[in-house]
A protein has these predicted regions:
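Internal hydrophobic scaffold segments of catalytic domains
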Residues: 5-8, 112-127, 180
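Short, charged, low-hydrophobicity "junction" segments
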Residues: 5, 15-28, 99-100, 129-143
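Right-handed parallel beta-helix
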Residues: 41-51, 72-83, 95-107, 118-133, ...
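Parallel beta-helix/beta-solenoid
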Residues: 5-53, 72, 154-166
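Single conserved hydrophobic/aromatic residue that forms the stacking wall/gate
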Residues: 1-7, 11-14, 172-182
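Glycine-rich beta-solenoid repeat tracts in large extracellular/virion proteins
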Residues: 9-12, 33-37, 56-57, 63-69, ...
Length: 182
């Protein structure tokens, strides 16, 4: 496929999210979701995304890679997102497993987990830039402004292993009650 004009990959497939079908961030009305946790979107291997992402409109940005309801039958391995203008990778629901992910220099969060994502993440390296970046990981269920609320199911519950995080500084601390939405 021709990827020369792609600013961001938006994967959307048939895996249950909250509610079952939703519009995915960064799209023009495309919906994602479904009820097949083992659904396959194919394979995404040996990919480097760099200098991508932008704000489509306030509160709706393109990530380096957006996974919208992607199932565990999808193979995602050996991926790097470098200097993205929003999140490195964001998961909106789904059960996709990701191995060997490198995130460097994201302007916002490096890993953003929402809407009941229940996949596995293994062998992940995150390096924040010194002058930008928000959270290394932002993980919540459903944002507080959503009509479906905090306690929606499925709940975000990823399994993570073999992570290395390199932060830009140690001066920032957060009160979880002030900085979370799920």
């Amino acid at each position: 496929p021709d990827v020369s004009s792609a600013a961001s990959d938006v994967y959307k497939r048939q895996v249950r999210t909250t509610p079952c079908e939703r519009e995915v961030e960064g799209s023009a009305g495309d919906v994602m979701g479904g009820e097949i946790p083992t659904d396959s979107s194919g394979a995404l291997k040996y990919l480097r995304v760099q200098y991508a992402g932008y704000e489509v409109f306030p509160g709706n940005e393109l990530n380096g890679i957006t996974f919208g309801g992607v199932g565990s039958g999808t193979s995602v391995e050996y991926i790097q997102v470098h200097n993205n203008a929003d999140d490195c990778v964001e998961f909106f629901g789904g059960t996709v497993d990701v191995k060997h992910l490198i995130c460097t220099g994201a302007d916002d969060d490096n890993l953003d987990i929402d809407w009941g994502y229940q996949g596995r993440l293994q062998y992940v390296i995150v390096q924040q830039a010194n002058d930008k970046g928000d959270h290394i990981v932002e993980s919540d269920n459903v944002n507080s402004d959503s009509a479906v609320g905090y306690l929606s199911e499925p709940r975000s519950n990823p399994i993570v292993a073999n992570f290395t995080f390199v932060s830009s500084c140690l001066l920032y601390t957060s009160d979880a009650a002030d900085d979370t939405s799920g």
